Amino acid sequence: MPHSRAVRAGQLALLLFFAISGALTGCSALTPTASERSSEAAASGAAAFTLQVRAPKEVRDYLEKHLELQRFRAFPDLQERELSRLLGAADANARELLATLGYFSPDIQIDLTKTPDDRRAPRAIVVTVDPGERTTIKALDLRFQGDIETGPTTSRPEARARAAWSLNPGEPFTQEAWDDAKKNSLRALQKRRYPTASLANSRADIDADTHQAALSATFDSGPAYRFGPLHLKGMKRYDAEGIKNIARLPTGAVYDETELLDAQQRLASSGYFDAVFLTLDPDAQQPGAAPVTAQVREAPLQKAIFGIGVSTDSGMRLSLDHTYNQLPWLGWRALTKLSFDREAKVLGTEWTALPGANGWRWVAGAQLQREATGDYQVNSTQWRFGRSQSTDHIDRNYALQYDSAVSQGPMAPPESTALSLNTGWTGRYFDSKTAPASGWGLAAEFGVGTTLRPERDPFVRALARGLYFQPLAKVTAPDGSSRRARIALRTEVGAVLARPGAQIPVTQLFLTGGDTTVRGYSLRSIGARTESDQLFGGRYLAVASAEWQRPLVFGGTVSDFESALFVD
């Protein structure tokens, strides 16, 4: 029996041990961690303390945002020892922040108050700051070394770097302005001639007693670079020389970042590639002929795009565009388009070769069209073969062109055909390619030819279009975005010279009217009258328009929409 009691006592002790262990484990599971407590505190809105900064506005907002104390407000279980450590470091932290704003001798007082009755937090911290006098720039010493000291035309790069320096004597010193000034001057050197330029050393000597700063910086230009050969990587399908002619990288010219980016953009917008990235070799053994690498990813060989749209001029529109980037055997690109709307049905194709070294390329095109022209339905055909050249601002072309037009309707003019030699020139000189506020553009066409049917009659055709933007006051939105209002002046004049009875294809004559020409009139509803008083194309054209355009502000930002007043 004693033995039996001993066993039961041991069993009870073991059960008691597991019960106590389980209870302790349960207590541990129910006790939240520090991170859980801070999350719960953040969710309930509780805080370890409130923080108030008393200082002039120009420094108060900055301190409230960047003081280290802000990070610990959401910890309601913050211990007194930890809070004392934070308060001890707060003075140095505030001084460091104020120094970045140019205040090197501030008076700072930090007070801690118990607030047991405040629901927001049990403590209140008040940081009182008198920033003192702001440090200003007393002296500036900019120096340059490297090729910029001995190379030709050294004064220009140095002048650009000095002009880009943005922190000058008399201006207040801030760390951000100091960093920006060095970065701006360095970028001015790197953008042209010296892509490997670096900041050799810089120093800001601060005199806290006089509140003045003496700045010095030395830039090392490194060697002068010129564009070397262009190497294409990732290209398998196209002729390398033709692609280089699209890029038009000025081999042998002084390195210019803008030229490099323009060449990259020309390749990217050519349609032959999905991705393009150009880089200059900064470690070239011969900086005077530094190779440039174009890393490309070719676009699909063929692409089809289906479109649907609507316009007030021609109603609903359906279109199908097909691109074949490299025709078999010929190697040219073919762009074919089929479109239907209320006014016209068009099937056309244009084939273009890669450009030669001079930028000129061969172009061939054909178009079949049925279009409402005046009071008639006109079936027309056009064949065109010639050459074209496109540069950044100017496009040129010349071509031999065949036109045929058959008009259908009461008292319709007879079928007419013509053969002509045409040339065109377009110049664009705007301040922006996408949203110009100033500048001008001009397009001119000139052709000489002869009708083939019903009779042979020589003719001359000329057409000119002009557009001019005059900038006005800037429209600024609450978010700081802005764009200028503008006045747009547009004109279009044309003439076809031939004997009075010559039957010129109507596709070579002029009709106007519609939302892009003379607003208030339907599409191509202004023209000449035939002997039977039917509306038809005329031999002379003159259109002028003046329009005031002002950007609209929506949602606090400048939108892409504009209000307009116009006279056509």
Model-predicted segments: where are they?
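Short beta-strands and strand-coil junctions in structured, solvent-facing domains, enriched
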Residues: 135, 191, 196, 224-226, ...
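C-terminal outer-membrane beta-barrel translocator/porin domains of Gram-negative envelope proteins
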Residues: 269, 303, 411-414, 418-567
